[in-house]
Amino acid sequence: MSFSAGESSAATGDPQDFNKFFGEINSPSEAAKTIKAIPKPSVALPESSECASYCASWVNDQSFEILPTDEENRQTEFSSSPLSDSVHSCLGFNRKKERKRRTSGDIEQTDKRKRTEERPSDKITFASNVFDNLARVTAERDNPEKLSKYKNIPGVGTRENIDEGISDINQPSSKSSGVKSKYVEVMSLFQKSIQKFSIMNLDYMYTFDWNHYSKKNIQYVVFTKVCQSHAPGHFVEMLKEDCSCRDCGSADLAVKVRLTVPLDLSDIPIPCSEDIQIHVSFLADDLLERHISSNVNRSSNRDDLDFSRRTCEKMYDLYQKMMRGQSSRMYTEWFDKCKIFVKNFLFSKSLHLYHGNVIRRKIEESQTLNKRRCFIFAQIFDLE
């Protein structure tokens, strides 16, 4: 509770003036009108001639006691004030206000001093660093030498591959940080950051798992589609479910065939609780050309295989009919020839994959066995 200057002067004046200020509480008629029962003060009111100044204080019944003071010009105090202990008088209350004002003023002056002392060179340095980093990233992105292995790949030139290749270039190479093991290389294919059509390569050479290849649940033949609206050196491949080119939007798509082989991971220390499989799919006409150019296995039935556009589209139609429950002897014979051709040509060879695309991943985690599958389209590779 605070009093103004007029209130404090009334409290230190004549008792009659004081009673006029708070109301005529000594008059029985006026007291009966305003207050039902006013307790008698503990100290009798002295005459005005006895003492010139008085002090008003709070009591529990919210009435007032008029206490004499010794000094005539003494500041009026609240003897039993309900306010906090730090406020004992009007003067102390005003001093506290002044102290708060002075403290806030000091804070404002300190902030102004900090703002004036702040060097503008810091902001300039920060801005220059930001623009330097932006210029460096732009230079790396526009540098044709760094993107040559993605732009100048024969048979590969999709827009998605180039964009994702830029992100791979900016990431630190695993070779620079140290030689990674085969296990780390295989498990890196199942990281959360890897998405569909992500570009990848394998540093190690891998042989093929022919024991697993003989199982019937392997998808040996995979149908894809290639856009025919691009230049002859620009190869844009999509999944068989696509109806238009993801690069240019053209609907002129040709059916292609890929032949799939699982990699041999027996020399990798994989825990017993992990069932990991990596399947690599090669373009059938590319394998056939490599087989023709080589001097081995001339006795194989390569002359009976045909991966032309007409043959691939015909086999794709038969494949769709088989998926609907119909049987096709022609497709079964062609499928078996593809299996024999792949095994005869790749049986004693090892794969070194320089450029591939992660097409599909499947991760199943259970309490007893964790299954991890990765399906890769091989674009640039060596067979030794």
UniProtKB/Swiss-Prot annotation:
Taxonomy of origin reads: Eukaryota, Metazoa, Ecdysozoa, Nematoda, Chromadorea
Instruction: Kindly provide the name given to this protein in its UniProt entry.
Output: Uncharacterized protein K06H7.7
Q: Superkingdom of this entry's organism?
A: Eukaryota
Biased composition of type Polar residues is found at 1-11, 76-87
For bias type Basic and acidic residues, the affected ranges are: 103-121
UniProt region (Disordered), positions on chain: 1-23, 69-121
